[in-house]
C-alpha cells in the first residue's frame, strides 16, 4: 500500500487547480490552521467533480499536529445557482455547530482534565441517534 503524499494528492486535482491547491497545502503546513477550499478533482474514472473541502488538524497525544481530517462536499451534481445557496447554508451551520462543540470540549478538558479526543468521543455518543450506533458497535 502506498502512502498518501502531497504529490499524489495533486495528481487527482484538475490541472488548472493544482497551483491553488498546492498553495493551500503549503499554507496549512506553515500556519497549522483549519481550512476550506473549492476546486475540481479527477476521480479514478477520469470524471471531473467540483468539490468543497473542509479540513482540520489531527493531533497526537502530545498535541503535535500529525495530519488532517477532511470533509469533501461534491457540488458538481446540482445546478450552479441552487448549490451555491445550499453549500453556503451548510457551511454556516457546520461552522456554528463547530463553535459550540469546541467550546464544550474545552470546558470538559478544563474541568475534568481529559485529553483532546475524549470530549469529542463523549459528545459523539451524546448526539440523538448515535446511541444506537454506539450500542451496535
From Swiss-Prot:
Domain of life (superkingdom): Bacteria
Protein name, entry field: Uncharacterized protein ML1796
Species whose genome carries this gene: Mycobacterium leprae (strain TN)
Amino acid at each position: 500500500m502506498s502512502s498518501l503524499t502531497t504529490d499524489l494528492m495533486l495528481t487527482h486535482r484538475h490541472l488548472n487547480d493544482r497551483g491553488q491547491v498546492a498553495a493551500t497545502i503549503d499554507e496549512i503546513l506553515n500556519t497549522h490552521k483549519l481550512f476550506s477550499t473549492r476546486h475540481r478533482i479527477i476521480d479514478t474514472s477520469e470524471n471531473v467533480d467540483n468539490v468543497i473541502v473542509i479540513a482540520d488538524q489531527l493531533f497526537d497525544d502530545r498535541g503535535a499536529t500529525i495530519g488532517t481530517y477532511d470533509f469533501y462536499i461534491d457540488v458538481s451534481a446540482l445546478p450552479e445557482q441552487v448549490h451555491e445557496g445550499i453549500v453556503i447554508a451548510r457551511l454556516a451551520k457546520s461552522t456554528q455547530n463547530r463553535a459550540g462543540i469546541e467550546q464544550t470540549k474545552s470546558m470538559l478538558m478544563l474541568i475534568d482534565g481529559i485529553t483532546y479526543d475524549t470530549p469529542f468521543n463523549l459528545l459523539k455518543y451524546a448526539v440523538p441517534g448515535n446511541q444506537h450506533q454506539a450500542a451496535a458497535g
